[in-house]
Regions:
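Short, surface-exposed, charged amphipathic helix/loop patches that serve as local interaction elements
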Residues: 2-281
Length: 281
């Protein structure tokens, strides 16, 4: 999920089949007594309040059917949002019913930052399927394909040390000079959320650089109001671009650490790999 952690994919589209299953599920028929805390938390902008506690339930057969429809379209990040929309039953005092229904709840789920989403998905997988993840890697030394298994409990969770508002200030080393000769250098960058991942991931899978450009246009805002467009990000110096990319990576260095040590049985070398996804298979 490393790629998904840095960039990510598509607009909310609900098929009639999935909507039918969503409407038919009865949350009273499943246990919902599994409580956790997000590493960063949901920031309620209206009230200036940070909410960290949340509650999940175990997945059902209806959930599996609904997610299978999304998986068929090969929409990895949308599966995460859909699974959370269904199985994350409470954030603070908010529930699907209290916020006005599935559409409003879905937007709240999409607004959760990526590391918080990944943390919640890991807990849902642990109680619903199993505590073990299978991951595939290729040895960089000999090219051997390796299948490895990891326990979810073995993955470290790094604490969030950033701002409550989940933004950081930036100051570009060189800055962007517009057609009027005005220099734009400073602004804010926020953490990527589930909607960012949904929109950007398909682009990043095809062209990683374009995915990075799209993600940064969504995350960055100049403090003077000048729009941070794709053309701006293509015209700024590589030094400025790398600065924003690295700042984004630093901001994302919390939550579940998906990097693992992998040993090659063929040549014996040990290398750092990443767990690409948490699936419900």
């Amino acid at each position: 999920m490393n790629e998904a952690k840095e960039f990510n994919e598509a607009v909310e589209e609900k098929t009639d089949g999935v909507k039918e299953v969503l409407d038919s599920i009865d949350d009273n028929n499943v246990d919902s007594d599994l409580e956790y805390e997000f590493p960063a938390g949901y920031y309620d902008k209206e009230n200036g309040k940070l909410i960290k506690d949340f509650e999940i339930r175990e997945m059902t057969g209806a959930d599996e059917e609904a997610l299978a429809g999304v998986a068929k379209k090969n929409k990895g990040a949308k599966i995460i949002n859909k699974a959370l929309e269904r199985c994350l039953v409470r954030i603070g005092n908010m529930t699907e019913k209290s916020v006005g229904g599935i559409d409003a709840w879905g937007k709240i789920i999409q607004s959760l930052c990526v590391p918080d989403q990944d943390f919640a998905i890991a807990q849902i997988q642990k109680v619903s399927v199993e505590d073990e993840i299978e991951s595939s890697h290729v040895c960089p030394e000999c090219g051997q394909k390796i299948r490895t298994f990891f326990k979810l409990d073995e993955l470290e969770v790094e604490p969030y040390r950033g701002e409550t508002e989940q933004v950081e200030l930036f100051e570009l080393p060189r800055g962007y000079k517009d057609k009027k000769g005005v220099l734009h250098k400073s602004g804010v960058i926020r953490l990527p959320n589930g909607l960012d991942r949904e929109i950007v991931l398909p682009v990043a899978k095809t062209n990683l650089s374009k995915g990075t450009t799209l993600m940064l246009t969504r995350l960055c805002t100049f403090d003077d109001g000048y729009p941070m467009t794709e053309s701006v990000l293509r015209e700024i110096s590589l030094k400025d671009r790398r600065y924003l990319e690295n700042l984004n990576k630093e901001m994302l260095s919390f939550g579940i650490d998906l990097s693992v040590d992998v040993e090659c049985n063929n040549c014996g070398s040990v290398f750092k790999g990443s767990i690409n996804s948490l699936s419900f298979q």
